[in-house]
Regions:
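Gly/Gly-Pro- and Ser/Thr-rich, intrinsically disordered tail segments characteristic of DNA damage-repair
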Residues: 1-232, 238, 242, 284, ...
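DNA-contacting surface of Y-family translesion DNA polymerases
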Residues: 2-3, 190, 198-341
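Short small-residue beta-strand/loop micro-motif enriched in glycine and branched aliphatics
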Residues: 81, 306-310, 355-357
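C-terminal hydrophobic structural anchor segments
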Residues: 318-319, 323, 329-383
Length: 418
């Protein structure tokens, strides 16, 4: 490759949750879960218990990620099941990312078990990218006890596609001159970011492989999938992606809170009080900093340990708790499909000066002013007497609370401002 071209690595932990549990057990002299039929999953007696990670021997029994643990046990009665351990996953993820960060000037954390490295300009240190990838892969295995795949290319899309090739413990390249040979023959469902609905639409048009999509006219793809989605996926099929590797998100600094649950959250009646308390905490913090937000994001984590995030841009910036909560609940209802949840979070970004307000001719100004006075009254009570001295009734009546962390942050802000 040319020295002026970008060089991107994508590193993905192989069966992360199972591998991390296995590494711990091996260090304790216990059997390696990767070598026996095993899985990480919930309690088989619970309806919501599912397989979130499985070993290769378990896969040979037909056990699938996402299926009920009870079904997996019917397929393999001697299946070893271990419970999820969030503290272990966080510890292993941090150690994994620390090693990756030591290899490149810029690292982007893509998920708990994936990172992108921008290796551009490191040719004097690592003249052979493949050798460098092997060095990184082997260092992780040697020091942490689990394996990774490394994908190498000139952009993030192709690097991630490459890391999904044969597993485990492999290094793969997918440079632009390798696309036709390595990527185009793959089934269309293998294309990164292609959803099931778009896949079905393409199959209905006779598009079976990534190469079929790449060779199709862009205008046809846009007609089938919509202008924006169609254009993006057509470009992806041709290996085109100019997104940068970002060490931090490029969104404006904002306020956020997340709540992790020991037990599954399964009903919308459980979710709404949690969202209200989160929005209440964040809006209070934001008003104390004299800010308003233009963007509201809601994140939730399902039993496969993947976060789903969705956001909405507001027509006018706001700092009102009720407005933020209404938008957060709308977002959640639009995107939640009823899966059991282990985490819910809200983020407020796109911050503006709180003293500026854009007026609308059609806005219910009387109702808005009433809500503003309510927020101001609650803010004053909390500032004078403490954050726990006043709480909304719907939150008090709920047994799901967001915990101490967010409120501790509010307490610290009180101290700073006094």
């Amino acid at each position: 490759m040319k020295s002026t071209e970008r060089l991107i690595f994508h590193i993905d932990v192989n069966s992360a949750f199972l591998s991390w549990e296995s590494a711990r057990r091996v260090s304790q002299g216990l059997p390696d879960l990767r070598e026996i039929p095993s899985c990480v999953g919930g309690d088989p007696k619970k309806r919501t218990g599912i397989v979130v990670a499985k070993s290769i021997p378990a896969k040979k029994y037909g056990i699938q990620t996402g299926e009920p643990v009870a079904m997996a046990l019917r397929k393999c009665p001697n299946l070893v099941i271990v419970p999820s351990d969030f503290e272990l996953y966080d510890k292993c993820s941090r150690a994994f990312k620390a090693i990756c960060a030591s290899f490149a000037p810029v690292m982007e954390s893509f998920s708990i078990d994936e990172v992108f490295l921008d290796m551009t300009g490191t040719s004097l240190i690592y003249p052979d990218p493949v050798a460098a990838a092997h060095e990184l892969k082997d260092k992780i295995h040697r020091e942490l006890g689990f394996t990774v795949n490394v994908g190498i290319s000139t952009n993030k899309l192709l690097a991630k596609m490459a890391s999904d090739f044969q597993k485990p413990d492999r290094v793969h390249t997918l440079f632009p001159d390798e696309i036709q040979e390595k990527m185009w023959p793959l089934p269309i469902r293998n294309l990164l970011f292609l959803g099931k609905a778009s896949e079905q639409k393409l199959l209905n048009q006779g598009i079976r492989t990534i190469g079929d999509l790449a060779r199709e006219r862009a205008s046809n793809v846009q007609y089938w999938l919509g202008e924006k989605t169609g254009h993006q996926l057509w470009q992806y099929a041709r290996g085109i992606d100019d997104s940068p590797v970002k060490a931090v998100p490029d969104e404006a600094k904002g306020f956020s809170v997340e709540t992790t649950f020991n037990d599954d959250i399964t009903s919308i009646e459980q979710v709404f009080p949690i969202l209200l308390e989160q929005c209440d905490v964040l809006a209070t913090r934001m008003r104390r900093k004299d800010k308003k937000c233009n963007c509201i994001s809601v994140t939730f984590r399902t039993l496969d340990f993947r976060n789903r995030s969705h956001q909405t841009k507001l027509e006018n910036a706001t700092d009102l708790t009720d407005e933020i909560y209404i938008n957060a609940t709308r977002l959640f209802k639009e995107f939640w499909k009823g899966q059991p949840l282990r985490l819910i979070g809200v983020a407020l970004t796109g911050l503006t000066d709180g003293t500026y307000e854009q007026m609308s001719l059609f806005e219910d100004t009387e109702n808005k002013e009433r809500r503003r006075k309510l927020d101001a009254a609650m803010d004053e009570i909390r500032m004078k007497f403490g954050n726990d001295k006043i709480t909304r009734a719907s939150i008090m009546n709920s047994n799901a609370r967001i915990g101490r962390k967010a409120k501790a942050q509010m307490k610290n802000e009180n101290t700073e401002e006094q």
